[in-house]
């Protein structure tokens, strides 16, 4: 029978910070991680924008409160991508921001990144959760989102929701399609594709945890 717990200690924690109270039941771990997951993810696009300008914008965004970055730029030679990822991790960690590296566990480990982001093909081939603090995946279908949940990943990127220059022939699934694809799923989901910073409330109204942007962050 439940009863009031008088005189128990209460501690107010800042949203986005990890809880320090222990012990905590394991079932609460995904909830606490979701609370610590920022609502806006910036995805790097230095291949198109240029390294210098991209890093300048990143510093500005981090100073303005950005706290989650995905290093993409998969077309670069390994050495160039390693250097860029190291620079992003350094800048982000100076501001207390998280960094995940797209598709390359070796670079993620060597740079001290916080996690790994799996492209959809890597998600399909994955048999167990990679050994990183933060692991997410790109998903395009409800089945892929479900698979990410089965692997106990921390988040999924779902899209494209709206038309985007990255996929000019794809009109996007729209907000209705996004809501349908993510319905009933407990995994934190970011809306991807054609996003702007002022769309966060719209995304959350359709069931998203947040938004992911390659442009406009």
PLM regions with names:
Residues 58-64, 90, 94, 109, ...:
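Acidic (Asp/Glu)-rich catalytic clusters
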Residues 70-80, 160-167:
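Glycine-rich, proline-tolerant flexible connector loops at the mouths of alpha/beta enzymes
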């Amino acid at each position: 029978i439940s009863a009031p717990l008088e005189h128990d200690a209460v501690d107010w924690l800042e949203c986005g910070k990890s809880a320090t109270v222990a012990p905590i039941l394991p079932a609460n771990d995904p909830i606490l991680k979701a609370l610590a997951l920022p609502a806006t993810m910036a995805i790097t696009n230095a291949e198109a924008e240029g390294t210098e300008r991209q890093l300048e914008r990143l510093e500005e965004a981090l100073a303005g409160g950005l706290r989650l970055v995905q290093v993409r730029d998969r077309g670069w030679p390994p050495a160039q991508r390693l250097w860029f990822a190291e620079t992003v991790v350094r800048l982000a960690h100076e501001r207390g921001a998280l960094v995940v590296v797209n598709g390359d566990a070796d670079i993620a480990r060597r740079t001290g990144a916080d996690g790994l982001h799996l492209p959809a093909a890597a998600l399909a081939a994955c048999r167990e959760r990679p050994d990183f603090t933060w692991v997410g995946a790109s998903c395009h279908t409800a089945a892929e989102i479900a698979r990410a949940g089965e692997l106990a990943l921390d988040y999924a990127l779902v899209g494209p929701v709206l038309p985007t220059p990255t996929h000019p022939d794809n009109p996007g699934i729209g907000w209705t399609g996004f809501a349908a694809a993510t319905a009933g799923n407990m995994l934190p989901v970011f809306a991807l594709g054609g996003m702007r910073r002022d769309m966060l409330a719209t995304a959350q109204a359709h069931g998203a945890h947040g938004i992911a942007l390659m442009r406009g962050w």
